[in-house]
Amino acid sequence: MGGGNAQKSAMARAKNLEKAKAAGKGSQLEANKKAMSIQCKVCMQTFICTTSEVKCREHAEAKHPKADVVACFPHLKK
């Protein structure tokens, strides 16, 4: 005889829990630290890798008005 719906649900839940434990090793905080790959060369503040050029320019103009944007973020030079 086959199992009932409750038994199937419990088995699926247990299986998914094991998958989540295996896939979720490590901390989200560690992943966030690794994603901080853009760094201002003047003040060494880090930015997430998806930060736009506009945000980098805003930072340079607000925090380092005397320094050139390229001095802060060398990857922005064309």
Swiss-Prot record:
Name listed for the protein in its UniProt record: Uncharacterized protein At2g23090
Alphabetical list of InterPro entries matching this protein: At2g23090-like, At2g23090-like_Znf, SERF-like_N, ZNF706/At2g23090_sf
Start and end residues of each stretch annotated as Disordered: 1-28
Gene3D superfamilies reported in the protein's UniProt record: At2g23090-like
Classification via Pfam families: SERF-like_N, zf-met2
Superkingdom of this protein's organism: Eukaryota
